[in-house]
Amino acid sequence: MNQTVEYLKELTVIASPTGFTEEVANYLVKTLADMGYSPVRTAKGGVTVVLRGENDEQHRYITAHVDTLGAIVRAVKPDGRLKLDRIGGFPWNMIEGENCTVHVANTGKTHSGTILVHQTSCHVYKDAGTVERTQDNMEVRLDEKVTNEKETRALGIEVGDFVSFDPRTIVTDTGFIKSRHLDDKVSAAILLNLLRVYKEEQIQLPVTTTFAFSVFEEVGHGANSSIPAEVVEYLAVDMGAMGDDQATDEYTVSICVKDASGPYHYEFRQHLVALAKAQEIPYKLDIYPFYGSDASAAMSAGAEVKHALLGAGIESSHSYERTHLDSVVATERMVDAYLKSDLVD
């Protein structure tokens, strides 16, 4: 588990908003190659690696996404601040006050800043606490001596430059992990650690399995293509959603029965439940009302597979998120148990 957390820390510090994932993909390629694998880059920019199993006629496909929420420069304002367009689904208040980095395409340089509502100063604006946070009043205050549009553009900053959010990753003495982008870098870290263990211990899985790290999940079309024709089971490893009426918590693995796309495959879900019970893996079944996954994207694209979704319970999703090591352990055990099991009947 220590190595899983180390992978997570390494992943979260790499800026990878959807559409700006080259660095994280290079990290995956190097990490997997150092393990002894032969990773492949997809045309969309994702990374896959295939483990040949005893059954090489029917395959499995397992995914985690390494793209994250982020933003892109929409305009340079007359006062030199930046107007943003969001990447991924989140309300503006979830990034208010967050430090950020502007990745300048023209120069290759980065510039730090902070995302604020225009009416932030409570000594000046009476409506600082009540004004609706919208694209028109949320802005980036750059950490540069700029007071107008010309000075900001002189830095090379232009429309289309990506903006990443400071992850602020912390692991507490009590076992909690606090960070942005636990969705879905926790899952990616879990898959990396399992791949490491399988290689070091020379474990052959019962079924040939493609491990896919996707880079467009947050905008709805992650690992929905390049699925081998032999694949009959598709498992997305992604965060479990917490909140009112939710069963998911920070200490178990969450198995999704339905999200915004509809129900997941019943027999596949029950296969996972049976494994959890047999191996005493703490789990919860849950519904995620406003949610989609790589697996649901694949189904929408026409994949003819059984599909399922599970993951660690993540509190405050798409904000400053939190989970616990207990949930990470349960999720890793669940994925391992599934990959070592027979195909779903």
Feature annotation, model-predicted:
Residues M1-D345:
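N-terminal hydrophobic/helix-forming segments and targeting peptides
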